[in-house]
């Protein structure tokens, strides 16, 4: 909004949307895990603006989890928000996207490869990256953009659950600016901060025989 865009915001709580105090923003409360709720928000948006230019899926959940405390119900909830919700959004808005517009999925570098404590979080983010890649192959020839954002650590209520030092930690504002700047490049993947994500990309290239022992050593696990 600060750069002149007309913005619509969605979340389950309209009070949280109002608390953002973004001037002239259209508030569309909805639940990303509920198809009917997304359809209602879409109808309200089209009634107000007659079209959709760019959609960003930022909904996310995170619970640190390892095999010793694996909880299927919790893991399914996390995946439902992080991945299934993104598919629901895509199904809702794809008919409205036109050349010059597009859709952005916020995933994570945790989706590159398996990591300690990411038993519930990582798989959904990996699936989201794959989903975005498939959509890009289909939609790019039509002039419709698809982007995936893979941040490192961002200081939020979710990452506050971590009991370890988070390298290259960004504020939400810094992450938002990096995302907007990344969209200007036209590149499919937007990843930041580079000093951290480049390390993660290097690790992702390693064969398992090197990757597993190195990650255990780096994480103390």
Predicted regions and their residues:
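Active-site helix of classical SDR
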Residues: 90, 124
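C-terminal helical subdomain
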Residues: 148, 164-199
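Conserved glycine-rich Rossmann-like NAD(P)H-binding loop of the short-chain dehydrogenase/reductase
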Residues: 5-18
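Substrate-binding pocket helix/loop in short-chain dehydrogenase/reductase
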Residues: 66-67, 74-77
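Residue(s) in the substrate-gating loop at a strand-loop-helix junction
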Residues: 108
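Conserved NAD(P)H cofactor-binding loop of Rossmann-fold oxidoreductase domains
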Residues: 58-63
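Rossmann-fold cofactor-recognition segment
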Residues: 21-36
């Amino acid at each position: 909004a600060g750069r002149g865009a007309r913005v619509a915001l969605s979340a389950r709580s309209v009070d949280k949307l109002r608390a953002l105090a973004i001037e002239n923003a259209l508030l569309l409360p909805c639940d990303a895990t509920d198809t009917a709720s997304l359809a209602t928000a879409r109808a309200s948006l089209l009634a107000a603006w007659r079209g959709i230019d760019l959609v960003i899926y930022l909904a996310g959940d995170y619970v640190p989890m390892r095999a010793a405390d694996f909880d299927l119900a919790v893991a399914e909830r996390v995946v439902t928000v992080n991945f299934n919700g993104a598919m629901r959004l895509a199904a809702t808005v794809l008919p409205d996207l036109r050349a010059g517009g597009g859709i952005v999925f916020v995933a994570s570098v945790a989706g590159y490869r398996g990591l300690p404590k990411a038993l519930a979080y990582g798989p959904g983010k990996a699936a989201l990256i794959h989903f975005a890649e498939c959509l890009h192959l289909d939609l790019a020839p039509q002039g419709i953009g698809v982007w995936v954002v893979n941040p490192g650590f961002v200081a939020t209520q979710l990452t506050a659950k971590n009991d370890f030092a988070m390298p290259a930690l960004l504020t939400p504002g810094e992450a938002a600016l990096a995302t907007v700047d990344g969209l200007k490049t036209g590149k499919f993947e937007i990843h930041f901060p580079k000093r951290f994500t480049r390390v993660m990309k290097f690790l992702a290239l390693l064969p398992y025989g090197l990757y597993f022992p190195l990650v255990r050593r780096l994480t103390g696990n």
